[in-house]
């Protein structure tokens, strides 16, 4: 069974590699985005996709307003189930860049969804990271106010 290297990585997650995919288990009470970012950095993943499920106790969503080109962030502190976390991996300024969205279920069976800024795991966290083995870069597009794929880089 493969494990992440170094004390920092071992505290955040464990994993098993199958082909070009990694099955990643994130440790309880770990911030999910930071753990996935550290994992991709450790493995040298330059592009790929991420999906997963689990449980969280805190969530910060981000919503983009295209008219103002500004983000509105909102934090929720309650137990929630991740029904879907999905996103992609690329790089920007030679750093890992994760673009993640999440849908969570609340105890009243309503749902929240949006761009994932951060989430603190409170229970299991099971993710699949696929490595595309190619570099995909991003660049800032001032017309959109967003970091978008740049296939020329």
Residue ranges and their predicted role:
Residues 1-9:
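Single conserved hydrophobic/aromatic residue that forms the stacking wall/gate
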Residues 10-99, 103-153:
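N-terminal intrinsically disordered, cationic/polar leader segments
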């Amino acid at each position: 069974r493969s494990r992440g290297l170094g004390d920092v990585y071992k505290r955040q997650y464990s994993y098993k590699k199958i082909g070009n995919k990694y099955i990643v288990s994130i440790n309880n009470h770990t911030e999910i985005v930071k753990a996935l970012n550290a994992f991709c950095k450790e493995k040298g993943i330059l592009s790929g996709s991420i999906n997963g499920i689990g449980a969280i106790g805190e969530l910060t969503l981000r919503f983009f307003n295209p008219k103002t080109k500004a983000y509105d962030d909102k934090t929720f502190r309650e137990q929630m189930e991740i029904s879907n976390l999905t996103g992609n991996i690329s790089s920007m300024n030679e750093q890992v860049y994760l673009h993640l969205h999440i849908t969570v279920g609340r105890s009243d069976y309503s749902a929240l969804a949006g761009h994932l800024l951060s989430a603190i795991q409170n229970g299991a966290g099971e993710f699949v990271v696929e490595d595309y083995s190619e570099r995909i870069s991003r660049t800032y597009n001032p017309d959109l106010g967003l970091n978008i794929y740049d296939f020329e880089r």
